[in-house]
Amino acid sequence: MTGSHRTSHAGDGAPEDDLGTFQTLEQFILDRQDSFPHSTGAFSRLLRDISLAAKIVNRDMRRAGLLDVYGSTGERNVQGEVQQKMDALAHREFVQALRRGGECCLIGSEEHAEAIPLSTVSKEGDGKYIVLLDPLDGSSNIDVNVSVGTIFSIYRLPDGYEEEEPDPAAALQPGTEQVAAGYVVYGSSTMLVYTTGNGVNGFTLDPSIGEFLLSHPDIQTPSRGRLSSINSGYYHSFEEGLRDYLDWLQQKDPETNRPAKTRYIGSFVSDFHRNLLKGGIYMYPATESSPAGKLRLMYEANPMGFIAEQAGGAASDGHRRILEKEPDKLHQRTPLFIGSEEMVRRAEAFLQGEPERALSA
């Protein structure tokens, strides 16, 4: 990571006085509220509700080995994927937290076929936010104790929306319309990282006081990284341009940080978080079996794309900017190339059959 950040935090044996050097998430939101174009108390409360749900999920994650929350529910979600018990639990916690708060009128979740209406829309401005999320990304890794995460994206109802009952179609907005996005990574420590379009900031949960504390202010990702994250087991099902790019990454050239180091956990949040801080590219391309890609545009690619761009990186489907894609359904899939800008632009050039443009970059 090239931006400055604190590397220790209260709860690691630091004196109590050191707490004064840290800012809580709630304090940070209130301090920045005036610089946010949609500044309202409702938005601040919405972020508080999301962070509360994340704390509850984190608590249950820490006790997963002692509770009956490993394994699957025996059911499949709308994606056709086997639903893990922690998937269902995390979905329930986020829905309950957002329903209690009243700031969110619609929630779209990976675990539910349609957007869920949560509240009516008031003329005073309450209930005008839409939250799209993957409640627990990488949940198949839980029973082997690998880091997992939550991804969320926040929109407002379109200007001029007059209906009291929220229309699920209102959730289908391009990523450029996001007012905030973030993720939580449940790892050796629990971090919440988010943006409102004014940079990216990270907060580490101090379990001793139950607060997210600012630990990574103004995150900037290196423009050129050395990490490559992709499931290379599908190499022979990738299109030729991508295979050429992967081969190029493994050639030795210190001037362009090659050969790249391959790091792939299989948990999108964890892989993205590492590459955001250290510099690299995460790739989940189209394959023969998934020609439209595998990741979901609305609650995986768009929020992470917003964060990547705000940190100085880039996000593309290989041919165009992710945030500009027009959605036609909640669970729409997309290929994704995201991370350090120079690496994403080179990947695009190879995919578009212009390797000479990549080599001259």
Curated annotation (Swiss-Prot):
Write one Pfam family the protein is assigned to.
FBPase_C
Pathway assigned in UniProt: Carbohydrate biosynthesis; gluconeogenesis
Keyword Transferase among UniProt keywords: no
Q: Which cofactor does it need?
A: Mg(2+)
| Any single biological process term in GO | gluconeogenesis
InterPro entries tied to this protein? FBPase_C_dom (IPR044015), FBPase_class-1 (IPR000146), FBPase_N (IPR033391), FBPtase (IPR028343)
How is this protein named in the record?
Fructose-1,6-bisphosphatase class 1 2
Gene it is expressed from: fbp2
